Regions:
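Fe-S ferredoxin-like electron-transfer domains
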Residues: 50-55, 59-127
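Surface-exposed beta-strand edges and their flanking turn/coil or helix-capping segments
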Residues: 35-39, 76-78, 88, 135-136, ...
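Conserved SAM-binding loop
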Residues: 96-180
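N-terminal juxtadomain amphipathic helix
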Residues: 1-85
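Sparse, context-dependent recognition of short Cys/His-centered cofactor- or disulfide-binding micro-motifs
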Residues: 5-8, 38-40, 89, 95, ...
């Protein structure tokens, strides 16, 4: 059952070296943010091995199991990044740091991959052209807040659509896309 929804990492995702060292194994963990309704019957949850592997050749630490994106970030994903004050503050700081370091013009495109409810892009939207990409229906909240959002996974087809409709981005952000 696990193999249906995941893929074991047998070689480094950067160098292709098969010499991977296990740093820590935390057991089997279910995907986070799969909330059940209060009072509902507890059912067995699918779990995946949580092992951190290290490749000496590339120096990359990586998870030993790649879980299907539709399991980790389903359309019904319940979490909204705007809920957490510290995250709102961190994203505001990221915006301030970015505009100090990079000369961004009004028409430069900023894309956030895994944009969720548009929390990060809300900092950029008044002075810059923004676009969110997120697979969850929560992206509709961003659209209501005036943040153009593509509700889909970030993949080759999505990239082609973005390039055709919006052009190339000056800045691409991706936060909480390595959540598991």
């Amino acid at each position: 059952m696990i193999k249906k929804y995941s893929k074991e990492v047998t070689s480094c995702q950067i160098s292709n070296s098969k010499k991977l060292k296990s740093l820590i194994f935390l057991g089997y963990l279910p995907p986070v943010n799969t909330l059940r309704k209060i009072g509902s019957t507890l059912k067995e949850e699918i779990s995946f091995p949580a092992e951190l592997l290290y490749c000496n050749k590339s120096k990359l630490a990586q998870l030993g199991c790649i879980v299907d994106k539709e399991i980790l970030f389903p359309y019904t994903y319940p979490y909204t990044s705007s809920t957490t004050k510290i995250l709102r503050d961190n994203f505001a700081d990221l915006y301030k740091d970015t505009i100090k370091k990079i000369d961004i013009k009004k028409n430069d495109l900023i894309i956030d991959i895994g944009s969720n409810d548009g929390n990060l892009l809300s900092n950029f939207k008044n002075n810059h052209k923004v676009l969110g990409v997120t697979p969850e229906k929560i992206g509709k909240l961003a659209i209501k807040r005036g943040i153009p959002t593509i509700i889909n996974y970030f993949n080759d087809l999505t990239v082609k659509k973005i390039l055709k409709k919006y052009g190339k981005a000056k800045i691409i952000t991706a936060t909480n896309v390595f959540a598991h």
